[in-house]
Structures are given as structure tokens and as C-alpha cells.
Design a protein with these regions (language model features):
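C-terminal motif of bacterial Sec signal peptides marking the signal peptidase cleavage site
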Residues: 12-15
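Bacterial signal peptide processing site
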Residues: 17-19
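Acidic, small-residue rich beta-repeat scaffolds with periodic aromatic anchors
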Residues: 21-25, 31, 135-172, 244-246, ...
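Compositionally biased P/S/T/G-rich terminal and signal peptide-adjacent segments
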Residues: 24-70, 135-139
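Terminal, regulation- and interaction-focused segments at domain boundaries
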Residues: 53-97
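Beta-propeller blade repeat segments, especially FG-GAP/WD-type strand-to-loop junctions
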Residues: 184-185, 194-196, 231-251, 289-296
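Calcium-coordinating acidic loop motifs
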Residues: 212-214
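Glycine-aliphatic tripeptides that mark coil-to-beta-strand junctions in extracellular
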Residues: 217-219
Length: 314
């Protein structure tokens, strides 16, 4: 009889705990991981529960407030797809260079959202934190500064921060790289992050820098960087065009103008920027601007008073 009574008490306590857990989730109180059942993904995110958009994915809630939610899910790939499809804002994705790295981070400088995505196991469970930064949306650097320590933790202790063209040149020299500093429509200091694998991770939206190309002369895609705030989004790809020539392809996506292929080409020290299309390994040139030079690892107009402009397709 005593054993039966004890068993009944345990069942009653378990039922009460389950009800309490459900109520806490609905009220967005901070929960401890130990309070979450790990048997299945019963909770589904709903946008009405938060002050920022969230996709309806199955998950386990770790903690939740109106402005921040931590969860475990097997559906983290749809998070990035969901946010990239939103009409407002542009997303930057930060990931370590190694494909097996457990962490990625993507954020929206306008809407003030940061999502960190950490691998838990090999089954597909990932811990995701969605943080709504309700602050200075018009100042992306203040926003990034808040997460600077997080970014350092994600990558390596030897991350180099450059805030000017001279720092960029020094940073690339230290890493044994050649940096290309490209002006768009403003001449302002840039901030970039170079990780220990020599990949460019983050740059100012007004400029971009890429590392040198290391290949055996064959066509080889080595890096792809997409970023954009407002007027245009740039996807930058660097590859070896032939053993004697370096070519960097920039596909510039204007919000209302469509896309344009841009190439930055160096041939025996002569640098030119051309607009065109790549067909069967050849470039069909639509327009060019060749008054450029590389000075201490910096790609710039030969006359400093002439800023480089993104070429527009006629």
C-alpha cells in the first residue's frame, strides 16, 4: 500500500510540473534547460507571441521573453531561409571557415535581429538564440559592437580588426595576404574581420576587401561573400581566371535595377574594373574603368580625388 501511495504522489507531481511548464512558456518567462522535456519538439513558434517575426518551426524552448528566445530545434536551416525571404532588411551571415564548425551567426542591421546557431549533436539538434536588438537600427556598427565579443568567441583569438585602409594593409601583410580595398560611392574607413583561415568575414557595407587567391592556376572558387544594407546587395566571388590573371566577380543586385556582373581584374600590375558577363570562361565586356592601381595592398583610383563608382549597366 505504501508503495502504491508513493507512486500516486509521483504521478500527481509530474502532472503539476507539466502544467506549470506549459504556462511558463506561454507567459514567456525565462526557463531553465532542466525544465524542458527532451522527448520531442512539442512547441511551435508563433509570430504573435513576439515583437519580431519568427517562423513556425517545431522546437524545445529553453528560455523565452518578448525580445529574446532560446530554443533547440532540428529545423534550423529553415530559420535562415525564412528571414532571407522577408521583404524588409538584408541579412549578413557569419560562419567560421571550416565546414564542420559548430556555430554560425546571422543578423539584420536594420530590423535589429541577431540569430546564433550552435551545433549540439550529430543527429541534427541545434541550439538557436534569436535576439531582438531594439536599439540604434540606423547605426550598424553600434549594433555590431554589442556582439563583438560573441564574434570573437565564434572564430578565433587572432582575429584582426581593421578600421582604415592602412590597418587593412597591415593586417593582410601580417597574414601573408594581399588585400584589395575597393571604393564604392563613399570614401570612409572600413571595419573588417579576417579569421585565422584567411577568409574575410565582415566588412563595411560601403567597401569590401578580399584575400589573395591561392590556387594551382585552375578555375577555383575560394570565397563567397554576400552583404548589403539598403541600396544594393553584393555577392562577391573570387576565383582564378587563368594562371597569369586574377579575376574577382562581383554580382551587384540593385533593389530596383536588377543585377549586374562586375569583374575586378589584375594583369601584370594593371588593374581594371569591368562590367560584363562570363560565358564559357570568357568575359563579355560591357564597360570598363581602368584608372586604378594597387598601392600597399590597396586597390584605389590613381587620382585620390576620383572615387570609384559602381558601374551601372546602360
Amino acid at each position: 500500500m505504501r508503495i502504491i501511495c508513493i507512486f500516486c504522489v509521483i504521478l500527481i507531481m509530474s502532472g503539476c510540473r507539466s502544467v506549470t511548464h506549459k504556462k511558463e512558456v506561454q507567459n514567456h518567462d525565462v526557463l531553465e534547460t532542466s525544465d524542458i522535456s527532451t522527448d520531442n519538439f512539442e512547441h511551435t513558434l508563433k509570430s504573435d507571441d513576439f515583437d519580431f517575426p519568427v517562423p513556425e518551426i517545431s522546437c524545445k524552448i529553453i528560455s523565452s521573453t518578448k525580445y529574446k528566445i532560446s530554443l533547440i530545434t532540428t529545423d534550423s536551416e529553415n530559420l535562415e531561409k525564412y528571414y532571407k525571404k522577408l521583404k524588409e532588411g538584408n541579412w549578413q551571415v557569419l560562419r567560421p571557415a571550416t565546414s564542420g564548425s559548430p556555430v554560425s551567426m546571422y543578423f539584420n542591421g536594420f530590423d535589429g535581429l541577431v540569430i546564433t546557431d550552435s551545433k549540439i549533436d550529430d543527429v541534427g539538434n541545434r541550439e538557436v538564440v534569436i535576439d531582438y536588438y531594439n536599439g540604434k537600427r540606423d547605426n550598424s556598427f553600434e549594433y555590431i559592437k554589442k556582439y563583438e565579443d560573441i564574434i570573437r568567441d565564434f572564430f578565433s583569438d587572432d582575429v584582426i580588426y581593421a578600421i582604415s585602409e592602412y590597418d587593412i594593409s597591415e593586417a593582410t601583410t601580417k597574414l601573408g595576404l594581399r588585400g584589395f580595398y575597393v571604393y564604392t560611392d563613399k570614401i570612409e574607413p572600413a571595419k573588417l574581420i579576417i579569421d585565422k583561415y584567411n577568409n574575410i568575414i565582415l566588412v563595411n557595407y560601403d567597401q569590401f576587401v578580399i584575400s589573395d587567391i591561392d590556387s594551382d592556376g585552375e578555375d577555383e572558387l575560394i570565397t563567397r561573400l554576400g552583404y548589403g544594407f539598403g541600396r544594393y546587395i553584393i555577392t562577391l566571388s573570387a576565383f582564378k581566371y587563368n594562371p597569369k590573371e586574377m579575376v574577382m566577380l562581383c554580382k551587384t543586385q540593385y533593389e530596383q535595377m536588377g543585377s549586374l556582373d562586375m569583374f575586378i581584374r589584375e594583369n601584370n600590375g594593371n588593374v581594371e574594373v569591368i562590367a560584363g558577363k562570363q560565358k564559357n570562361g570568357e568575359i563579355d565586356v560591357l564597360g570598363s574603368y581602368g584608372n586604378l592601381e594597387i598601392n600597399n595592398g590597396v586597390l584605389r583610383p590613381k587620382k585620390k580625388d576620383i572615387p570609384f563608382k559602381i558601374l551601372e549597366e546602360n
